[in-house]
Amino acid sequence: MAAVTQLGYVGLGVSNVEEWEHFATDILGLESNGVDEDGNLSLRMDEYSHRFIVQPNGKDDVEFVGWQVTDEPALREIVEQLRQAGIEVTDGTEDEIKSRRVEGMIRFDDPEGTRTEIFYGPPISFDRPFNSPRAVGFVTAEQGLGHVVLYVEDLDRTVKFYRDVLGMKISDFIRNLAFFHCNPRHHSLALIEAKSPKKLNHFMLQTQNMNDVGATYDMVLDGAMPLTRGPVSYTHLTLPTKA
């Protein structure tokens, strides 16, 4: 069975791209690639040419989630798994492949209607090292972007999809939450069963050290952004190593 290997990129639909660029660069420490001719902003956090694509459509929600696979055979195997599960799959257009800067991709909606993309040939910029405007570093590599947490109305159905069709493994269950991993990161995806007008609960970026977290927290306390939740310590960010 083919399986996704990491959270590759996230697309966001927003009301104000300029404010998002300020938030992403000045607060989070991501690097901006600027805005393209369609008004889309792309953002970097490592050697990939982008990890976020921000689109000016006013939704203020997740627009799509991109999962990486190892190669084209793995992508084609996942296509068959999706079709056997009754999911309508579409190959990425030339414009979409160019926009994502990947070698190949497919797209479909998950059982909750979240647009999902799977790609191979990651968008790496070998000639341009990541340059954070805040000198922040992020933990990515085989662990991917970080994690994304989505609201769902039918947890059982959606768990079966990500586990049995996309090959993710369950890390934990906590009441109405399910956590999935596809690499050493404890979870790259979490699902919350709850009614919500939005699909996105949050995304997580892991910095390379606690100092970066503290400096960002200080900026927020100084009024850079509204604080919705204070510091919290995760029990573990990666899966326990087997003895």
Language model features with spans:
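Core segments of cupin and vicinal oxygen chelate
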Residues: 2, 8-50, 96, 150-188, ...
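Intrinsic, low-complexity N-terminal interaction/targeting segments
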Residues: 52, 114, 126, 136, ...
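Internal, well-ordered alpha/beta segment that forms a basic, Gly-enriched binding/recognition surface
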Residues: 100-123
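Short, structured motif recognition centered on aromatic/hydrophobic residues
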Residues: 7, 30, 43, 52-54, ...
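Vicinal oxygen chelate
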Residues: 6-15, 57-83, 104-110, 144-153, ...
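Surface-exposed beta-loop interaction hotspot
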Residues: 126-153
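Asp-box/WD-like beta-propeller blade repeats and closely related beta-sheet repeat scaffolds
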Residues: 92-99, 132-135
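Conserved small/polar residues in nucleotide/adenosyl-binding loops
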Residues: 235-241
